[in-house]
UniProtKB/Swiss-Prot annotation:
SUPFAM superfamilies xrefs: NAD(P)-binding Rossmann-fold domains
UniProt xrefs under HAMAP family: GDP_Man_dehydratase
Lineage: Bacteria, Pseudomonadati, Pseudomonadota, Alphaproteobacteria, Hyphomicrobiales
Name the record gives this protein: GDP-mannose 4,6-dehydratase
GO molecular function, one term: GDP-mannose 4,6-dehydratase activity
Entry EC number(s): 4.2.1.47
Source organism per UniProt: Sinorhizobium fredii (strain NBRC 101917 / NGR234)
Catalysed transformations (reactions): GDP-alpha-D-mannose = GDP-4-dehydro-alpha-D-rhamnose + H2O
Keyword Lyase: yes
Keywords tagged on the record: Lyase, NAD, Nodulation, Plasmid
InterPro entries per UniProt: GDP_Man_deHydtase (IPR006368), NAD(P)-bd_dom (IPR016040), NAD(P)-bd_dom_sf (IPR036291)
Binding site for NADP(+): 11-16, 66-67, 88-92, 103, 163, 189, 194
Amino acid sequence: MTDRKVALISGVTGQDGAYLAELLLDEGYIVHGIKRRSSSFNTQRIEHIYQERHDPEARFFLHYGDMTDSTNLLRIVQQTQPHEIYNLAAQSHVQVSFETPEYTANADAIGTLRMLEAIRILGLTNRTRFYQASTSELYGLAQESPQNEKTPFYPRSPYAAAKLYAYWIVVNYREAYGMHASNGILFNHESPLRGETFVTRKITRAAAAISLGKQEVLYLGNLDAQRDWGHAREYVRGMWMMCQQDRPGDYVLATGVTTSVRTFVEWAFEETGMTIEWVGEGIEERGIDAATGRCVVAVDPRYFRPTEVDLLLGDATKARQVLGWRHETSVRDLACEMVREDLSYLRGTRQ
């Protein structure tokens, strides 16, 4: 046990945290995860890998914590003495960041600083490697397409602005203190573990529910927004690969393929056996089930963002050349996988 690498994951109960914890355990690590205290259970994504801490073979441990509490983070880092820290915790919903801009800045921006300071104060600079979950939302009103590590940033939300501070403070601590600290600029990555408030999961869950007669209509905002969507399981491997390099750096992880929300909707419903036909324009546009003529998709202006990000498309050439990382799952296969999982869940047959 003492010869094993030790990893600390903030945001371990999220989509990426769950996949990353599973990967690290498979790689032989001792894994510590930080989770926020909640009045309801929030560990569903990691229940299959959790071990009772009194089990002599246990290698996965949870700690209560919060990115807004510096003394708490300092204590956890001191207790765990990690070889690698993966900072995935964040208020990561773009729309919500417009409603909670101060909290988003506190958790996402200053929270990253708190974690870096814990490493520095505890004298772990030469021991601990740091991964920061950055985001393609940094590019916002993209100045060029596709976007790579040298593309100028233009954040278009409080979330993206907070993540921009986090990005640069990681670069600053890397240069000022010699930390092995890397930014992963990850484009959108989804999975059956994606939260239901994110658009891909909202779409696949609704398509499944509508096909089973459990929901009437799916309401969406900008149908023409385009994103570069990949599979989260493949992206967390890229995170791990960054921390295995001799030198730290910043890397884009992306598929290099862009897909509109509209197309993702069509694929999701197609997996349930339904064909969507579009009628109307603008906020009056609707998606009709071709077989029945019933409206199953509608536009709701409340889901438009105050400042939209219309097109994000990533260039992961550096990650391919330096890390040897590449995506494998197509966005269409990803959509179908998510729908199948949602159908199983709603039918009560998911294992």
